[in-house]
Amino acid sequence: MKPVLLSDLFKEFPIPWATDVAPGAIPISAIYYDSRMVRRGALFVAISGGSVDGHEYISSAISRGAVAVVGTREIRGLPVPYIRVADSREALAYLAAAFFDHPARQLTVIGVTGTDGKTTTANMIYEILKQAGVKAGLISTVNAVIGDEVVDTGFHVTTPEAVEVQGYLSRMLAAGLTTVVLETTSHGLAQHRVTACEYDIAVVTNITHEHLDYHGTYEEYRAAKGRMFASLAQTVEKPLGNPRLAILNRDDISYDYLAGLVKGRQVTYGLQHKTDYFAQDVTSNPSGVDFTLIAEGLVERVHCNLPGKFNVSNCLAAFAAARAAGVETGAAIKGLSRLRGVTGRMEAIEMGQPYSAIVDFAHTPNALKVALETAREMTTKRVIAVFGSAGLRDRQKRRLMAEVSVQLADISIFTAEDPRTESLESILAEMADAATLAGGVEGKTFYRVADRGTAIRLGAELTAPGDLLIACGKGHEQSMCFGTIEYPWDDRTAMRATLAEQLGLPGYEMPHLPTS
């Protein structure tokens, strides 16, 4: 990419900044927030957060070739220009947008946020747009899709950093795309990873109990999600038009708050209240869901291939977003009927075993509840659930999830899920205590098995023909964290290895963990 002058990066910089040396005609070849990645001609943005403070690595960045630095500390005497700002993350977002020549201003940007269902809904919208002939791209917590190219966006689930997001948007624009669906997490919003993304359409799935370890309270978590909707009013005028539309879930507890936050246009969807996009007469079976769609004067019976009644709500949100993006009604309905499953979301693993095996990403109390309710719809026999709860995260969540599982599953197996530096034994003890208080009986209706592979094996051993075994919490993720180390792990690989062992099939190996 052609270098951009440092002075040009600050031409439309919307937040206060100060420097002893005005940004001049210094060519900037790249922007980095990790000093280890810096190369000659780069701008280094020092970010404080977590266990690392980027300001401690300014000298290293300069020695690697940084020609300018942005940070929040009062620093003098550097051999390169230093620009001080109040928030380095916010600055990084605006600088990245300017570096890539503000690609979001030339695209229709559809943001999807929520606690549960946002990856599925984002993929639904993307698939409907593509099938309708819209030149669309996707940035999710699983991958970025740019034309025929699919880019992995990382091991764990969150929105990519601002430089990566703006880079993806730039590549999409260069590839001739006109629309992008951007899955947007609360961390992505709170940490300004999606600042300067110029949202045109904002969609919420739901806002329930999650990430309170980071946000502190539900209200703060909800406020972080709300930033996307508040930002609609600031979206610049675009050649493609300015929908500036909020799509809200009338059935969710977040509705009143978000409806009050949105200053412009908004539409609603739901199953429990009369809304702009309404569904009734829902039926579900292992092959998908059927419902009657009532919207825009239309009453139409719709089929979706994704199982679970919860997906009806996702369908409504996706349909509303597609219509807002200009897709004709008939094409949007046809798109719903052709949707494919999302990796790691109620994903069936089929190897000829006499029972159902599912891998799902459910890692919150509400998502686990929905996953187990869906599992109940998929079998008339028993449901056996294998899952854990992450370390160094909201501790209340692990108790709530254990309670949900002993109430909805016939057998629950508590196991590792990214314990990080927290004691796995303590996490499992908390889950077992909550399960016991909820009426569970250890050794009969629930078990503790530290090693996740062994836990999945136990689940398989306990199944009978017609049962359903579901492993929740990891979904598409490709690693698990013990201590500070990420170990390769994929629940789908582990499930296949387990089934292969049972069926006597060669060629499958269980991933190894420190607990193995």
Predicted regions and their residues:
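Receiver (REC) domain switch/active-site residues of two-component response regulators
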Residues: 67, 200, 410
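Non-catalytic positions within long, well-ordered alpha-helices that form the structural scaffold/packing
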Residues: 58-63, 173, 195, 376
